[in-house]
Amino acid sequence: MITPAEEQFSARHAYVPEHLPGYGRAFSGGEAFLVGDYLGYLREGTLIFVGYPLEETYNEKKMKALLAEAMRRFQPFRVALMAPSYSEPGGERKAVDYYYRLDLRSSRIPSKIKNMIHRAGRELRVEKSREFDAEHQKLIDDFLGSREVEEGTRVIFQKIADYLSSVPAAMVFDARDSQGRLAGFDVADFGSEEYAFYLFNFRSRKFPVPGTSDLLLQALIQEARNQRKFYVNLGLGTNEGVAFFKRKWGGMSFLQHEIILLSPRRPSFLNSIFRGMFSA
């Protein structure tokens, strides 16, 4: 559904991870497509529409017009829209969140974080690779078993191995102790021209080392600099603890993120879409 040239175009201009076709295919199980300046994924009657334009400035009215075009083309039973904003009433709406971004051209590591990195570095070493094995899966399973996690998030975590095996630009950063035990790992994607993407972070609950996540993120940032990226998309805030970690590194919220689940086969939904498209 998407040509090699379109896939390269999308990845080159990606500033949210869903813009990366390899990432989107791996975690949605769908086929990527482009409509205008927007990327989407289609799987078994479900359309996932990434409402962030690849090149243009976001315009909700234009986004809704292209969403309507995609719905006419594919006739989905369900639509999951992610966008900076969506003013139409109706649909099942998830909590509003924000993407955080670190500007590598101006960022400096705060002294408190340097201390944590130094502390963790006395016990751990960081290795980068594309390997994902039972040790990594065990940390994911431990995380899922230790707290309540939405089913969608659980499914995504279980697809990380498939994602890594299918996307050459994806990389794993491991933190290991002197005995070779895995204390934590990060997963990142470097497929965009300007952005690196900090996607997943897991730590060992069995032998936690203070500063593990800071040590790993430092290594990821250094790799992004080595690859001449301008930014690291640190991902969504998710909760206050996660958002605090990103802010302490200098991450700034730069994009609002909403998820709206829609039922396009309902006449009332289609009427509202078309009214919004042609209103002043």
Provide a role label for each language-model segment.
Residues 1-19, 260-280:
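Membrane-proximal basic amphipathic "stem/tether" segments
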Residues 23-82:
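N-terminal accessory interaction module
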Residues 169-270:
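Aromatic (often tryptophan-rich) hydrophobic motifs at membrane interfaces
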Residues 70-71, 120, 224, 246:
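Generic structural signal for hydrophobic
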Residues 2-44, 84-209, 218:
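A conserved beta-strand-loop-helix scaffold within acyl/acetyltransferase catalytic domains
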Residues 82, 129-131, 235, 256:
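Conserved beta-strand termini and adjacent loop/short-helix elements that scaffold enzyme active sites
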Residues 72-84, 225-235:
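Conserved GNAT acetyl-CoA-binding A-motif
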